[in-house]
Curated annotation (Swiss-Prot):
Gene3D superfamilies: Classic Zinc Finger
GO cellular component: nucleus
Lineage, broadest ranks: Eukaryota, Metazoa, Chordata, Craniata, Vertebrata
Keyword Zinc-finger belongs to the record: yes
The UniProt record lists the keyword Nucleotide-binding: no
Family: Belongs to the krueppel C2H2-type zinc-finger protein family.
Organism for this UniProt entry: Xenopus laevis (African clawed frog)
Descriptive protein name: Gastrula zinc finger protein xLCGF3.1
Record key words, sorted: DNA-binding, Metal-binding, Nucleus, Repeat, Zinc, Zinc-finger
Pfam families to which the protein is assigned, alphabetical: zf-C2H2
InterPro entries: Znf_C2H2_sf, Znf_C2H2_type
Function comment: May be involved in transcriptional regulation.
Amino acid sequence: TGEKPFMCTKCGKCLSTKQKLNLHHMTHTGEKPFTCTECGKGFSRNDYLKIHQTIHTGEKPFTCIECGKGFSINRTLKLHYMTHTGEKPFTCTECSKGFSTKRDLEIHQTMHTGEKPLTCTECSKGFSTKHKLSIHQRVHTGEKPFTCTECNKGFSRNDHLQIHQTVHTGEKPFTCTECSKCFSRKELLKIHQIVH
């Protein structure tokens, strides 16, 4: 029916069930009773823990019908699918650039405002998004949740793991438009292009 009779006394948000209200309360208390057995990271909800655990298992049950790329959660697949359809329903009021998700738009808008509302408790460095702060905090914690299946080397970021894996695969996806020489990393291509 769409009825949401349970209201949070902290922020006024209304939810449809008492259970959802209890889960929501954890966003205010910071309580994280669900813990990953692999890395010890805590979560406020069990479904968030299950999504996180796919980082360790490598499980990607949701597959894009266009390109065959696998995803650990259905929502990420739906967002990815927009790269094929070109759908960008969220538009920046400053520069008219379009985005496929509201979150991407919000992240982009911090470029215009220069806003960095999130601060690292360890070093006071400011960040525009929770995701960027979370990645940065691994510098302090030493957490490396992304592991190479070939050599077991750990990485703090997934993109760093993907770059590393080209050592094993021999893949060189970055090609020089001038001479067709291939490189495993974008930075190496940029250094090479100075020659031309």
